[in-house]
Regions:
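Tandem CBS (Cystathionine beta-synthase) repeat/Bateman regulatory domains
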Residues: 1-170
Length: 170
């Protein structure tokens, strides 16, 4: 049975999702009352057509990271470790809360010193509602999408979800 919360394909008859531990009993599965709710529960994150993320490795200098963000007009960078696996995320919020307060020499600092390590992630085939729930619970503006190996392959922003909901309401 496919979990309506995270999209994981569980064994038939399972009472609880092996991935997210949500109940799979019919009484606990929410039912959609509107087309928007149905879309959030059934449409995959991939329907947002997430953009390819800009990535840097953990040893990139903060000066270089800031320049990339400014030149590409983006609000975040995904930070990768060896083998390309996602190690963290550097957002505008990180810059304001961590870097701006300390005002270190940016050429000498590395992104790994200021990134948010081990960020929440989703996969392109997860239900949109699951991604939205992760963003709300964790107070995120950006949600990295990863493949089965943990390598980033997309990013979804709160603006993407708002645009999707607005489009489906009209």
């Amino acid at each position: 049975m496919k979990c309506p919360f995270c999209g994981y394909d569980n064994l038939p008859g399972a009472d609880q999702c092996e991935q997210c531990l949500s109940s799979l009993t019919q009484d606990d599965i929410p039912q959609a009352d509107s087309g928007v709710e149905r879309s959030l529960m059934e449409d995959p994150v991939a329907c947002l057509q997430p953009i390819r993320p800009l990535t840097v490795d953990t040893h990139t200098s903060m000066a270089e990271a800031l320049e990339l963000m400014r030149n590409h007009h983006i609000g975040c960078l995904l930070i990768t470790a060896e083998q390309g696996a996602l190690a963290g995320i550097m957002t505008e919020r990180d810059l304001l809360q961590k870097v701006a307060l300390e005002a270190p020499p940016l050429e000498q600092c590395r992104v790994e010193d200021f990134m948010s390590a081990a960020p929440e992630t989703s996969k392109p085939d997860h239900p949109l509602g699951y991604a939205l729930q992760r963003m709300i619970v964790s107070d995120l503006r950006y949600l990295p999408l990863v493949d089965d190996s943990g390598r980033p392959n997309g990013i979804v922003s709160s603006r993407d979800i708002i645009a999707y909901i607005a489009k489906n309401l009209i």
